[in-house]
Amino acid sequence: MKSGIHPDYHPVVFQDATTGATFLTRSTITSSRTIEWETPHGVRTYPLVVVEITSDSHPFWTGSRRIVDTAGQVEKFHRRYGSRRQTNHRDDAAHSP
């Protein structure tokens, strides 16, 4: 591999925000939050990334239904950017002198 062109690929702990389940894997993502994780070589500190849905809570893997708050995301978008009215440029061109 060429040195200096690849992102830093390191161990990271992901935590499911719903269930609290954690798992250690490798990723290029970084976080200022950390967690102590017990390994066969002793306790080590790893970056902690909290995610909304993992295989531990996703309906496809659990077989149960779970309502995801997409409506809240849409409302947040409308509050932030407002409901902008789309103009029809053909109508504007027809009424211009």
UniProtKB/Swiss-Prot annotation:
The keyword Ribosomal protein applies. This is Large ribosomal subunit protein bL31B. PANTHER family: 50S RIBOSOMAL PROTEIN L31, CHLOROPLASTIC, LARGE RIBOSOMAL SUBUNIT PROTEIN BL31C. Belongs to the bacterial ribosomal protein bL31 family. Type B subfamily. Part of the 50S ribosomal subunit. One of its GO terms (biological process) is translation. GO terms for molecular function: structural constituent of ribosome. GO terms for cellular component: ribonucleoprotein complex; ribosome. Pfam families: Ribosomal_L31. PROSITE patterns: RIBOSOMAL_L31 (PS01143). The gene is rpmE2. Keywords: Ribonucleoprotein, Ribosomal protein. NCBIfam families: L31, PRK01678.1.
